[in-house]
Each structure stands twice: as C-alpha cells, then as structure tokens.
Amino acid sequence: MSTATDTAAPAKKRGSGLFQGLQKVGRSLQLPIAVLPAAGIMVRLGQDDIFGKDGLGWDKVAAVFNNAGGALTGSLPILFCIGVAIGFAKKADGSTALAAVVGFLVYSKVLEAFPVTEAVVQDGADVAATYNDPGVLGGIIMGLLAAVLWQRYHRKKLVDWLGFFNGRRLVPIIMAFVGIVVGVFFGLVWEPIGDGISNFGEWMTGLGSGGAALFGGVNRALIPVGMHQFVNTVAWFQLGDFTNSAGDVVHGDITRFLAGDPSAGIFQAGFFPIMMFGLPAAALAMAHTARPERRKAVLGMMISLAATSFVTGVTEPIEFSFMFIAPVLYVLHAVLTAISMAITWGLGVHAGFNFSAGFIDYALNWHLATKPWLIIPIGLVFAAIYYVTFRFAIVKFNLKTPGREPEEEVEDLTKA
C-alpha cells in the first residue's frame, strides 16, 4: 500500500508542476496584451473621421497616429516574444528581453529562406514572395525558449579565456542558434500546421452561433485556473486572415477587426452585454442580498466594481467575489456568457475591443462595428436576467456571497 502511495505522489507532483507552468504561461501573455489599448487609441485617432479628411482635416497628423498604431499591431509577434520571456522567467532583466529579441530576429529571417511562393517580377506589377507566418504563436514559443534558457544559463561560467561571455552575455548567443533551429523547423512544417489552424477557425466559424457560444463558455470556464489566455490568444490573434490597406496580412479576430475586416468581431461582440450590463447587475444583486447591517458597505464596494466593469471591461474583481465561494453562480455566469455570444452572432453583431469589452472600447470602435447599437438592448435584457437569477440563487441556496458571510468570519477579517 505504501508503494502505491509513493508512486502516486510523484505523479501528482508532476501534474501539479505542469499545471502551475501552464498557469504561469497564461499570466505571462497578459504583459504583451497590455499594449493593445495604446495601439487601438492611436489607430482610432488616425482614422479619417477624427484627424483625417472627414474630421479635422489634419491628414499628416492622422497619418502619424495611424502609422504609430500600425507599428504596434503589426509587431505583435515580437511583442509577445519579449513579453512572454520577461513574464515567464524568474527575476528577468534586460538581458532576458535581449535574448528573446535576438532569437526572434534570427528565427523570423530564417523563415524567409523557405518561401511558400516565389517573387515574380513582371511588367506593371511585381508580386512579392510569401512566407510561412506562425504569427504570435511563433513569438510565444521563442519567448518561452528565451525564458527557459535564460533561467538555465544566465549564471553559467565558461572557461577563463571565454570569461567575457559568462552568464547573461551567453544567453543571447545561445538564442541566436536556437532561432535558426526554430526557424528551420517552422519553415519546413508550418504549412500543414497553419492549414490546421485555418481549418479549425473555419470549423468554429461554420458552427455559427454554436462556435461563438463554445468560445465564450470556455473562455469564462478557464478563468478560475488562469488558462483562458491560451484560447484567447488562438481566437483573437491567430484565427483567420485579412489583408489590410497597406497590403499586410493580419491574423486573429482582434487584429483583423482593428484593421477593418468587416467579418471580424464575432469572438468579441458577445462579451459587451455581459461586461457592461450583466456583471454590474450581478454585483447589484449581491449587494441587495447582503445582510442589512453590511448592505451599505457591500453596496459601496459593488457599485465601484460595477462601474469598473461597465467603463473598462475589467470584470475579475466581480467574478472573484463569487467564483470560489459560490461556484454555482460562476457556472451560471459562464452559461450566460455563452448565450450572449450566440445571440450577438445570430443577430449579426460584430464589435471588438483593444483591451476589454467596456464602454471605452465600445465607443472607441463604434465606427468599425456592425450593428453596435444592438448591444445596448441585448445588454439590458442580460442585466435583468443576471439580477433575477443571481438574487434568486443567492437567497434560495443561502450562498455566502459578500455581506452574507457568517458573523465570526467578518470578525476575523476585521481583526486581521
């Protein structure tokens, strides 16, 4: 019996380590995603109806902002590479980022040694060569490799006559050669992998409302374990392709939406009714069901969280207030999110965001959206559903949401 227990323990430890590693990767993806609001604002200011010919008529100013925003949206792979390397490595510093950049630059240039189609020089219009483009996935992989190798070798000491290359100076050199290997690998095998991702995207799109619902439900379901960024990265930065006005091919629902693809926004629109209306209503329901002596304090807190969710789309403070103490409410929330995604898809609503599905992004990207006005009535309906269902479940099952904790827990928190 002890042997079985001893065998099970290491297996459990290995599984736990893998899970924690995946969580860490998911958290590291948040750093590069944080630059998107800046990109979105600059691209918006560069549109014709703001600083351009249909707005203030400052064409040069519009071009400056448009190019500035395009520099960020067009460089997402290397931004993900740097962000993941810094976010994943323990005690990362500038040498971690340098190693990631060196590896990525080599990797991306090596890809050009494997053209999918050759360049054609002809009278009238030359056709440029096309290359395999793993996009942000390649950047993430290079960032992870840089973080792991930096962690392993940044204190490595070589023989005396190579002492100049000890430690942090060694890792960028290693990453240069790793970039060659990864570039050759993707150059040889990316085409079927890319086709598989494209086919998966077409399959998800082909499911119609069901595909949007599946994504929305999985997105919310993975938040408690911190792994939702994996599915977000695939859907928002990898699926689909669109050629923008500059002739560059961009990938992913967010990037395509910001580039003006009218078919994009299907994996984002359904979050607006939830984040702007549904969750704020849930917060109000929790405040109204708090014990009378705690209702005022909880109401003040929940109004603040609801305003944050509505304006910015930051929902974690509300979600974590009931996620673990009342899991049934979180399951309900995930299901309602899936339904919202399905409804917006079914009604032909296309909307997107730079950061999250709050009012700022809703207003900022109105001009790029299709039927954005429908989000308001849909959201009001979901607000009513969230309030009624949350209030009913909290009272019916005596759920210990904020303000309903046992008295002794409140006293302990006060003493702490």
Curated annotation (Swiss-Prot):
Disruption phenotype: Mutant is unable to grow on GlcNAc, while growth on glucose, fructose, xylose, mannose, sucrose or galactose is not impaired. Mutant is insensitive to GlcNAc.
PROSITE patterns: PTS_EIIC_TYPE_1 (PS51103)
Main localization, broad class: membrane
Signals that turn on the gene: Induced by GlcNAc. Transcriptionally activated by AtrA. Expression is repressed by DasR in the absence of glucosamine 6-P (GlcN6P).
Chain ranges of the PTS EIIC type-1 domain: 16-406
GO terms under cellular component: plasma membrane
GO biological process: N-acetylglucosamine transport; phosphoenolpyruvate-dependent sugar phosphotransferase system
Residues that span the membrane, as ranges: 68-88, 96-116, 130-150, 170-190, 196-216, 266-286, 298-318, 323-343, 344-364, 375-395
Keyword Cell membrane in record: yes
Pfam families recorded: PTS_EIIC (PF02378)
InterPro entries in the record: PTS_EIIC, PTS_EIIC_1, PTS_Glucose_EIICBA
Keyword flag Cell membrane: yes
GO molecular function: protein-N(PI)-phosphohistidine-sugar phosphotransferase activity; protein-phosphocysteine-sugar phosphotransferase activity
Domain of life: Bacteria
Localization, UniProt: Cell membrane
UniProt keyword annotations, A-Z: Cell membrane, Membrane, Phosphotransferase system, Sugar transport, Transmembrane, Transmembrane helix, Transport
Topology term for the membrane: Multi-pass membrane protein
Described purpose of this protein according to its UniProt entry: The phosphoenolpyruvate-dependent sugar phosphotransferase system (sugar PTS), a major carbohydrate active transport system, catalyzes the phosphorylation of incoming sugar substrates concomitantly with their translocation across the cell membrane. This system is involved in N-acetylglucosamine (GlcNAc) transport. High-affinity permease, which exhibits a narrow specificity for GlcNAc. Essential for C-signaling between vegetative growth and development.
Entry's free-text remark on domains: The EIIC domain type-1 forms the PTS system translocation channel and contains the specific substrate-binding site.
PANTHER family: CYTOCHROME C-TYPE SYNTHESIS PROTEIN AND PTS TRANSMEMBRANE COMPONENT, PTS SYSTEM N-ACETYLGLUCOSAMINE-SPECIFIC EIICBA COMPONENT
Name assigned to this protein: PTS system N-acetylglucosamine-specific EIIC component
Naturally occurring in which organism (per UniProt): Streptomyces coelicolor (strain ATCC BAA-471 / A3(2) / M145)
Gene: nagE2
